[in-house]
Amino acid sequence: MKKAIKISALLIFFIGLTAMSVHRFYVGIYQVDFVPQKKRLEITTRIFMDDLNDALTKAYKKQTNIGDQKETPEDVTLMKKYLSDKFKIYLNGQLKTMNFHSHEQENNVIICYLTVKEVSKITKMEVENSILTELHDEQQNIIQFNNNGKKQNLLLSSSTTKGMLK
């Protein structure tokens, strides 16, 4: 009887561990730095590779392989389009064009490097970010903004895809 209880307790323990490892986090990190000497914003995005490929496949009805050896120039073009459609920055009330420079893979994360040019002064910045929100209701996109040493954070989600930083 004691042996059966011990086995049951161990079984419940291992099932609990397994359930915990299945749980996923749905978070993207977006670092936005104002570099006044260069009159630009420098943006670094960190998005989980599998989620990004799933979103691209869903949006464009084509299997993509961003971050994989099978990655094609067409995959990168679709990623650029997706970022442009889903991630927007308004400075002082005006929509700004983001320039995509490059991307790299670090473990299971895709890191993209973007800039916004011709930025002399920021009085307010509005961010619209709906990346991956079409896949996961739990998706959170964290915007970290550094404006001349003043740091601000903004948490966006599938229910709140826009926010203001001053």
How would you name each of these model-derived features?
Residues 22-166:
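N-terminal soluble domains immediately following signal/targeting peptides that reside
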